[in-house]
Amino acid sequence: MELHIKNLCKSFDGSPVLENVSFTAGPGVTCVMAPSGAGKTTLLRILLGLERPDSGNFTGNVRWAAVFQEDRLLEHLDAMGNLRFVLGAALDETAAGALLTELGLGDTAGKPVREFSGGMKRRLALARALLAPSAALALDEPFTGLDEENRARCQALLRRAGEEKPVLLVTHDPADAQALDAAVVKL
């Protein structure tokens, strides 16, 4: 499955944020790179249907799973409770337990998310996206707050996910693209 983005434009209050953005993303990891404030998050919001472009189009009507800059977790639930609440009947609890363990969250049963560190919350948000039944992943700065070891774990999981579906990741860090062996789109 391929996503085709063609001539996307978006302005806010007359100031252009995206100007004629075009690229194709197939299975694998594609990193959209630009400095802070250059429209990376806006691009993801358009693809996710949360914003409307001023002009241009994209094809690939897909079900997305996303990691936003804010983790959007339920603070009073534990890790598995967050996954159950969001994914419902689609959740494979055996796979979820294995993924939580792989992400270093296997020993958090019963611990409310409000007691998690920022990096733990980030890994849980990534687990939620990876477990969701989706055709593509949209990830907004998914490695923020992760130490080197956990960053490498998450990168390995995203490379693996990219073998089956498009993984669109926005970042300003070229090291992310290199570690993910990603195609790069510069805004």
Where are these regions (language model features)?
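Helix-to-loop junction immediately C-terminal to a conserved catalytic motif
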Residues: 48
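Helix N-cap at the start of a conserved alpha-helix in ABC-type nucleotide-binding domains
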Residues: 148-150
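Hydrophobic anchor residue at the start of the ABC signature
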Residues: 126
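Conserved ABC ATPase signature
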Residues: 112-116
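Catalytic Walker B motif of ABC-type/P-loop ATPase nucleotide-binding domains
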Residues: 137-141
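Q-loop/switch helix immediately C-terminal to the Walker
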Residues: 77-89
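Conserved ABC ATPase "signature" region
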Residues: 91-108
